[in-house]
Amino acid sequence: MKVAVIDLGSNSFHMVIYRIDKDMSFRSRGHYSDVNALGRYISETAELPLEKIRESVKSVSHLARKARGAGVDRVYAYGTGFFRKIDNSMTLVDEIFKSTGIVVEVLDEKAEAEIIFRAACHAYGLK
């Protein structure tokens, strides 16, 4: 089975494709990035301009095509601090879903920290 994980941040979108083996171990099979510097486009009203929403959707669509081309079975997408910061994050989430069928989960601070901790433990073989 292959899965893709997309991290949607304020400066870049990253996608890593993993192959999950029967023993539930996994191996990276590709990494793709799109630098967008979205954080600098937040208006004084804490909204991402419509033009940047469209560009973000285009970027995620590109990553989705890469995932499909790699034979990915499932895509997981996560919005982090940037999504918590902007007032129109649900508009961005909805537009990404409409265009790609990908559901973006906006992580709260605790969930984001836990995922980072677990990833670090896995990377360094800690239990």
Predicted regions and their residues:
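A glycine-rich helix N-cap at a beta->alpha junction
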Residues: G101-L107
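Short beta-strand-loop/turn "lid" adjacent to the catalytic site in phosphate-handling enzymes
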Residues: A64-D94
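Short, well-ordered amphipathic alpha-helical segments that serve as non-catalytic structural scaffolds
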Residues: R54-K66
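Short glycine-aspartate micro-motif
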Residues: V3-D7
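Conserved phosphate-binding catalytic cores of ATP/NTP-utilizing and phosphoryl-transfer enzymes
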Residues: M1, L107-K127
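Short glycine-rich, Thr/Ser-proximal phosphate-binding strand/loop in the N-terminal lobe
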Residues: F13-L50
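Short, glycine/acidic-enriched loop or turn micro-motifs at the edges of active sites
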Residues: S10
